UniProtKB/Swiss-Prot annotation:
Annotated membrane topology: Multi-pass membrane protein
GO CC annotations on file: mitochondrial membrane
Subcellular location as annotated: Membrane
Phenotypic effect of disruption: Morpholino knockdown of the protein results in profound anemia without affecting erythroid specification.
InterPro entries in the record: TMEM14 (IPR005349), TMEM14_sf (IPR044890)
Protein family (similarity comment): Belongs to the TMEM14 family.
Gene Ontology terms: biological process: heme biosynthetic process; regulation of heme biosynthetic process
Residue ranges crossing the lipid bilayer per the database entry: 3-23, 25-45, 52-69, 81-101
Protein name (record): Transmembrane protein 14C
Gene: tmem14c
Sections of the chain in a coiled coil: none
Amino acid sequence: MAVDWAGYGYAALVASGGVIGYVKAGSVPSLAAGLVFGGLAGFGAYQTSQDPGNIWVSLAASGTLAAIMGKRFYNSRKITPAGLIAGASVLMLAKLGAGMLQKPQKS
């Protein structure tokens, strides 16, 4: 059973981004979205750590954030926060996709 450190790091990045948005701009929607999506990503990382084939919560959270923040980045061209989160989400999608393509390992 391998721990999904990348998934936990991604969850921490998303949640801390929401907190930073609240502290800097007083944005309650940023705080709520950051904590909800960070929590979902953290839960997905926990599930992936328990069963490497169970990637669906992580896939949904990172895919949704990649789409939403990618659209925001396309419209605003601002690296932070939209570009950073969109990029991290695309990297998580690539990691999850690569994990799906690997053969299962016998333990």
